[in-house]
Amino acid sequence: MAVSYNALAQSLARSSCFIPKPYSFRDTKLRSRSNVVFACNDNKNIALQAKVDNLLDRIKWDDKGLAVAIAQNVDTGAVLMQGFVNREALSTTISSRKATFFSRSRSTLWTKGETSNNFINILDVYVDCDRDSIIYLGTPDGPTCHTGEETCYYTSVFDQLNNDEASGNKLALTTLYSLESIISKRKEESTVPQEGKPSWTRRLLTDDALLCSKIREEADELCRTLEDNEEVSRTPSEMADVLYHAMVLLSKRGVKMEDVLEVLRKRFSQSGIEEKQNRTK
């Protein structure tokens, strides 16, 4: 079972006391009140830091004081990179909300993005059941790999075993994003003249009326699985059709599935009524 540090990280973010420049108070009463407020904030920070220290004490660090840390995209599920952390690196990540690691070669902390500005913004931190490995769950500002690839994992072992090196770099994608990648390739191919019968995806990409009519048709068939009390197995089948055709429309519009999932994530803590009121008209 994984343990989340999200609540603690949010508390630290809210409680930090940042003073942009020194304050001078001519009013003695005002100065007195401000001292009480700052002291209160200091006490809260001390209490929160004590919680952080307690959590860090429970991590099973190796004989060098390190643990493996894996960064994962909160929206796509893609594994971005893997590094090592010590107590200070994990503590810094929790407080700064930026993925921070420990460099074994330089024996120093480093924050992903400190030179490239491709930071990984941390939304949560998880520790595995044995408390000896960590997941940084967040959103990347850009490519994570120093090669410019989206993630550091783009070499398929099975492709190499099958001598299929012609396929080139291939990101480790989940089913949903593998489908998005295929649709994207079909979109690129649709600009090139083709002999013979085009694929169904290509037809949809080149015919807006057909695409929209299929989305409406498949959505209606999905609803009928409920209204007509069809076999339960029909529901995921029809939903797959809706999702596929909707993703073709997204590709046509230049919208990534990641953008959709980001919208959903941001709605988790917001009611539907509030969301509608805040929509840009």
Swiss-Prot record:
<keyword id="KW-0378">Hydrolase</keyword>
<keyword id="KW-0934">Plastid</keyword>
<feature type="transit peptide" description="Chloroplast">
    <location>
        <begin position="1"/>
        <end position="50"/>
    </location>
</feature>
<dbReference type="InterPro" id="IPR038019">
    <property type="entry name" value="PRib_AMP_CycHydrolase_sf"/>
</dbReference>
<dbReference type="InterPro" id="IPR002496">
    <property type="entry name" value="PRib_AMP_CycHydrolase_dom"/>
</dbReference>
<dbReference type="GO" id="GO:0000105">
    <property type="term" value="P:L-histidine biosynthetic process"/>
</dbReference>
<feature type="region of interest" description="Phosphoribosyl-AMP cyclohydrolase">
    <location>
        <begin position="51"/>
        <end position="178"/>
    </location>
</feature>
<dbReference type="InterPro" id="IPR023019">
    <property type="entry name" value="His_synth_HisIE"/>
</dbReference>
<dbReference type="InterPro" id="IPR008179">
    <property type="entry name" value="HisE"/>
</dbReference>
<dbReference type="InterPro" id="IPR021130">
    <property type="entry name" value="PRib-ATP_PPHydrolase-like"/>
</dbReference>
<dbReference type="Pfam" id="PF01503">
    <property type="entry name" value="PRA-PH"/>
</dbReference>
<keyword id="KW-0368">Histidine biosynthesis</keyword>
<keyword id="KW-0067">ATP-binding</keyword>
<keyword id="KW-0809">Transit peptide</keyword>
<dbReference type="GO" id="GO:0009570">
    <property type="term" value="C:chloroplast stroma"/>
</dbReference>
<dbReference type="GO" id="GO:0004635">
    <property type="term" value="F:phosphoribosyl-AMP cyclohydrolase activity"/>
</dbReference>
<dbReference type="GO" id="GO:0009507">
    <property type="term" value="C:chloroplast"/>
</dbReference>
<keyword id="KW-0150">Chloroplast</keyword>
<dbReference type="Pfam" id="PF01502">
    <property type="entry name" value="PRA-CH"/>
</dbReference>
<comment type="pathway">
    <text>Amino-acid biosynthesis; L-histidine biosynthesis; L-histidine from 5-phospho-alpha-D-ribose 1-diphosphate: step 2/9.</text>
</comment>
<dbReference type="GO" id="GO:0005524">
    <property type="term" value="F:ATP binding"/>
</dbReference>
<comment type="similarity">
    <text>In the C-terminal section; belongs to the PRA-PH family.</text>
</comment>
<protein>
    <recommendedName>
        <fullName>Histidine biosynthesis bifunctional protein hisIE, chloroplastic</fullName>
        <ecNumber>3.5.4.19</ecNumber>
        <ecNumber>3.6.1.31</ecNumber>
    </recommendedName>
</protein>
<feature type="region of interest" description="Phosphoribosyl-ATP pyrophosphohydrolase">
    <location>
        <begin position="179"/>
        <end position="281"/>
    </location>
</feature>
<comment type="similarity">
    <text>In the N-terminal section; belongs to the PRA-CH family.</text>
</comment>
<keyword id="KW-0547">Nucleotide-binding</keyword>
<comment type="pathway">
    <text>Amino-acid biosynthesis; L-histidine biosynthesis; L-histidine from 5-phospho-alpha-D-ribose 1-diphosphate: step 3/9.</text>
</comment>
<keyword id="KW-0028">Amino-acid biosynthesis</keyword>
<keyword id="KW-0511">Multifunctional enzyme</keyword>
<dbReference type="GO" id="GO:0004636">
    <property type="term" value="F:phosphoribosyl-ATP diphosphatase activity"/>
</dbReference>
<dbReference type="GO" id="GO:0005829">
    <property type="term" value="C:cytosol"/>
</dbReference>
